[in-house]
Each structure stands twice: as structure tokens, then as C-alpha cells.
Amino acid sequence: MPVNPYLTFRVATLEDVPTVLALLADDSTSGAQQGEYGETHRAAFEAIDADPGNELIVAELDGEVVGTMQLTYIPGISRGGALRMQIEAVRIASGLRGRGLGGQMLRWAVERGRARGCALVQLTTNKARKDAHRFYDSLGFVASHEGYKLALS
């Protein structure tokens, strides 16, 4: 396999959800949070799929899903009423990391945001993911804000 193979991207289908969950679970910082595929995942997918402000994207290599990310388009009053894109849950199959696929995914997402009229692309990442921080820095993202979460369940 080439060092930097070419990915194709598409909006996920319900049939992709188990593979997406497996990709999300293959992560040392949040993998245990995924749970087994079930009705809550189906309902979440259906809500995402029905919302034009959300896209669950899969990346394919030779017809196999090897990556995923969720894109959310957020209208706002700040920044002159700018539309922004939030990128979340970015994952590449662990056996394919380090081959430039994540860069392809993020560049594709940025172009998709630009095409939809977004003025800003933002993402959050776990503080423990130092390699991810270097990766996002290398793509031109700037660690300009501090994020907080409050678990409600």
C-alpha cells in the first residue's frame, strides 16, 4: 500500500454506523464511551441525517470505510453573522495512521466548509492527545481557546 493513499469521502448511511462506532472505539481517550451499537445510535444517526446542519462523513480507501468525522454547521451572531463549521469525532483506522490520511480528511472538510460559506472552521481535541495537537497545528489550526465540558449523564 502506498505511503499516502487517496481517500474518497461520502455522507454516511445507517449501514455505516457500526463501522463508525468501531473507529470511535479504537481510541485510548474516548473509546470506552461508545457502547454497543443499539437503538440510541440509530436514533442519533437518524437525527444527524435529517438535519441539514449536520453531516456524518466516512472516508473510504478501496471501498472500505477507514475514517470518519462529524461536521456541524453553526450559524452565529458573532463574527458578523458568520457561519462556522465544527469538526468532531475525527478518526482514522489505527493501522492506517501516520500515512497522511488524517490530513486528507481535514483538508477535505475545510474545503467542504468553504463551499458551504463557512467563515471559520473549529474543532476541539482532548488535552491528552498531544500528537493530535501537533497534527492540527501542522494543518494551520490555532489553539486559540480553552474548552470546557459538563457531563449531564
Regions inferred by a protein language model and the residue ranges of each:
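Conserved acetyl-CoA binding element of GNAT-fold acetyltransferases
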Residues: 81-94, 146
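Hydrophobic adenine-recognition pocket in adenosine-nucleotide-binding enzymes
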Residues: 12, 90-92, 125
